[in-house]
């Protein structure tokens, strides 16, 4: 797919990188692996009716690092036609050697989910940076990272698995910790994240 004109007209490159070789901007998420990461239906909907995923400005912003985070500005909205062309283009952007089919979409059992919740909240402290839901559906957690509520509609499971295992592969500088996760633990946390949704 050729790069759509809307990417230039809407100033997408002011906030996003479309290639690993471009300078890291720290304003919005990188898009050079969007095809590995994002689901098409969600992407089309987001581009036409943007919602807030990260409540504060990108975590490498200097104001964030000294304790004065700024709220994110609303994302620009595209027409349906623009969104379709842009999403088709973005989904062609992939890393050449990212292993797929690491995670199936079979949900965790009740017992496995309880164990994964302990890993997510206590062992690895993911809740310190990410919005999630408690047992009665109330929002809780930090805001320095993107919200994980309903993230299964947005993200592909294999990408989440690889992000948990090797975040530096996607972002050389950032606040995401590098954990020494075995595959089973990474899969379990990925599935737990995909179960954080407002309509179980």
Model features per residue range: what roles?
Residues 13, 17-46, 60-62, 131-162:
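Gly/Gly-Pro-rich "capping" loops immediately C-terminal to redox-active cysteine motifs
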Residues 37, 97-100, 104-106, 147:
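General marker for long, soluble alpha-helical cores
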Residues 1-19, 107-134:
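Sequence/structural segment immediately N-terminal to covalent heme-attachment motifs in c-type
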Residues 68-101, 177-200:
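C-terminal capping alpha-helices of c-type cytochrome domains
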Residues 17-20, 36, 48-52, 91-95, ...:
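Sec-exported extracytoplasmic/periplasmic mature domains
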Residues 1-5, 17, 26-30, 60-77:
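Sequence context of c-type cytochrome heme-c attachment sites
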Residues 134-135, 140-200:
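Structured core of small recognition/catalytic domains
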């Amino acid at each position: 797919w050729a790069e759509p004109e809307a990417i230039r007209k809407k100033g997408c490159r002011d906030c996003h990188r479309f290639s690993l070789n471009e300078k890291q901007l720290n304003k919005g998420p990188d898009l050079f692996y969007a095809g590995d990461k994002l689901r098409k239906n969600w992407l089309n909907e987001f581009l036409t009716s943007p919602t807030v995923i990260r409540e504060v400005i990108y975590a490498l912003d200097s104001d964030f690092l000294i304790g004065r985070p700024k709220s994110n500005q609303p994302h620009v909205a595209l027409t349906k036609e623009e969104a379709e062309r842009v999403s088709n283009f973005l989904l062609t952007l992939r890393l050449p050697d990212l292993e797929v089919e690491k995670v199936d979409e079979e949900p965790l059992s009740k017992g496995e989910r309880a164990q994964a919740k302990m890993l997510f909240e206590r062992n690895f402290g993911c809740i310190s940076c990410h919005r999630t839901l408690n047992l009665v559906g109330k929002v809780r957690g930090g805001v320095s990272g993107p919200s994980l509520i309903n993230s299964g509609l947005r993200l592909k499971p294999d990408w989440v698995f690889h992000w948990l295992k090797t975040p530096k592969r996607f972002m050389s500088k950032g606040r995401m910790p590098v954990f020494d996760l075995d595959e089973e633990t990474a899969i379990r946390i990925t599935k737990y994240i995909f179960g954080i949704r407002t309509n179980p």
